[in-house]
């Protein structure tokens, strides 16, 4: 969920819509699964962030700040859950050819220089498959040449 608005056009309702999904929804879901992972004394949580969580951009106040919040939650949960052998990894994709920005949720055609869900799934699988002795705290997945 994302809104592109300049600072003078920001509305609290837009912040709430994005934060309800990206921050509060993630937090509530994670709160529900953590007891099961603690009980089994292991687990891996993958949070999908965005490269927007690494650096803000013009008209990105709402979306970027929500992904910065996800990044902070991931870091807090890493520290909190490591004693229980629960790994938390945040995956930060750059632009991916999905229906993300389409209000009708129509999938976009694959673009030769943008990432696809396949690349992101490979990153997620690599983080999950790592031996439990280690964990990847954050993966930044960039399109090689998105400007071509």
Whereabouts are the PLM-identified features?
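Active-site-adjacent segment of SDR/Rossmann-fold oxidoreductases
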Residues: 55, 76-86
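Short beta-loop-alpha junction of Rossmann-like oxidoreductase domains
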Residues: 5, 90-105
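Catalytic Tyr-X3-Lys loop
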Residues: 1, 8-27, 46, 70
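A short helix-coil junction within the Rossmann-fold of NAD(P)-dependent oxidoreductases
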Residues: 5, 32-41
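C-terminal helical subdomain
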Residues: 84-86, 90-91, 106-148
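Residue(s) in the substrate-gating loop at a strand-loop-helix junction
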Residues: 50
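Active-site helix of classical SDR
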Residues: 30, 66
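Active-site loop immediately N-terminal to the catalytic Tyr-X3-Lys motif
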Residues: 55-61
């Amino acid at each position: 969920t994302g809104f592109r608005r300049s600072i003078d056009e920001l509305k609290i309702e837009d912040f709430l819509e994005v934060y309800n999904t990206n921050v509060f929804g993630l937090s509530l879901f994670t709160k529900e699964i953590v007891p099961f992972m603690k009980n089994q004394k292991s687990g891996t949580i993958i949070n999908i962030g965005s490269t927007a969580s690494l650096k803000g951009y013009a008209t990105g106040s709402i979306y970027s700040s929500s992904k910065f919040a996800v990044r902070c939650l991931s870091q807090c949960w890493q520290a909190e859950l490591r004693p229980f052998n629960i790994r938390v990894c945040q995956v930060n994709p750059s632009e991916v050819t999905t229906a993300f920005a389409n209000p009708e949720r129509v999938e976009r055609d694959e673009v030769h220089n943008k990432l696809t869900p396949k690349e992101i799934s490979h990153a997620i699988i690599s983080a999950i498959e790592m031996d439990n002795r280690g964990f990847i705290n954050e993966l930044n997945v960039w399109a090689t040449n998105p400007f071509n």
